[in-house]
């Protein structure tokens, strides 16, 4: 009798896995890379989804920040360092470097 239960449970489990995959609920967060070089962000515009990670790598010889105008994030990135932020809400976020205000970029965050 236990073998009969196991054989019935397998198709149910397979259906649950397929349903989860089709729903997108198991989607893996993406990491979007932004380089800081020559007093600039590159690329200057990216698109992410809620839950994705933005990763800045500072290859300049001086410190920079990635500071959101709306307050969503504010990270300081030392020379040779990397900083990461998980985006948590949809919308367009413009950000800049506090030390070098002409350094500007944006991220468009889409809902999951």
Mark where each language-model region is:
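Extracytoplasmic copper-binding redox domains, predominantly the cupredoxin/blue-copper superfamily
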Residues: 2-11, 17-18, 22-112
């Amino acid at each position: 009798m236990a073998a009969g239960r196991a054989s019935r449970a397998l198709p149910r489990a397979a259906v649950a896995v397929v349903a989860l995959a089709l729903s997108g609920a198991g989607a893996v967060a993406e990491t979007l890379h932004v380089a800081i070089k020559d007093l600039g962000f590159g690329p200057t515009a990216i698109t992410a989804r809620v839950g994705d990670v933005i990763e800045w790598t500072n290859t300049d010889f001086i410190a920079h920040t990635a500071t959101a105008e709306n307050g969503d994030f504010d990270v300081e990135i030392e020379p040779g360092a990397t900083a990461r932020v998980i985006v948590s809400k949809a919308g367009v976020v413009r950000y800049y470097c506090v030390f070098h205000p002409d350094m500007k970029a944006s991220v468009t965050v889409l809902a999951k």
